[in-house]
UniProtKB/Swiss-Prot annotation:
Thylakoid recorded as keyword: yes
Organism: Prochlorococcus marinus subsp. pastoris (strain CCMP1986 / NIES-2087 / MED4)
Pfam families: Psb28
Quaternary data: Part of the photosystem II complex.
NCBIfam families: PS_II_psb28
Keywords for the protein's UniProt record, in alphabetical order: Membrane, Photosynthesis, Photosystem II, Thylakoid
Main subcellular location: membrane
Gene3D superfamilies, A to Z: Photosystem II Psb28
Membrane topology: Peripheral membrane protein
Name by which UniProt lists this protein: Photosystem II reaction center Psb28 protein
Amino acid sequence: MAENNLAKIQFYEGTDEPVVPEIRLTRGNDGTTGQAIFIFEKPQALSSVADGEITGMRMIDAEGEILTREVKVKFVDGEPMFLEGTYIWKTKSDFDRFMRFANSYAKSNGLGYSEKK
């Protein structure tokens, strides 16, 4: 459970990622399936002080943890620049749970939401 009801993201267990990502959502035509793509520019997880192997992205809030293993590093001029995590949902309940995390994360980080028209 998250302390103080603050939602957070971790790439290393017990270490919060301070860089706030750009988050893009897409949903399937049936409205049940979809994905959220998190793009972190110059995340601390890729810094020289980071220690260990990234095995996934943990989204943690007061309800618990959502885990995805879909994490990629993108390089620019040979240097790690972006970390991209993708969470895929296959049911409405998975989507609803993700949206509760997303709303909590937005509140914890002073973020807003805009819908693409």
